[in-house]
Amino acid sequence: ASLVADALALRGYAQADAAQRRQQAWESSCGPMLAGMSRATEIRRGVMTVIVGSSMAMQEVSLQKETLLQRIRQELPEQKIRDLRFRVGRLDS
């Protein structure tokens, strides 16, 4: 295998690992009920985007936004998350 292929494989692994860590931190922050209705999809410029599966779930996370933000900051302090953005969408497993 080439050095470039090895580097790309390592980068892909690192991205998958970061996605898994982000989702685990979200689940730990929001609890099992909300975790089953939502997925943390990305963190960009200090904003974590969370996809929720329904308008009911959107209302629930919106009502709990400040608490969820405090918890996710504790779970991922190195990410310096300053805001949560919620969107209704399809939850891909």
Regions found by a protein language model. Give the residues of each.
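N-terminal presequence-like segments and adjacent domain-start helices
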Residues: 1-28, 36-42, 78-93
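Single-stranded RNA-binding regions, centering on S1/OB-family and related RNA-binding modules
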Residues: 32
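A short interface-forming secondary-structure element
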Residues: 45-65
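Short, non-transmembrane amphipathic alpha-helical segments
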Residues: 58-80
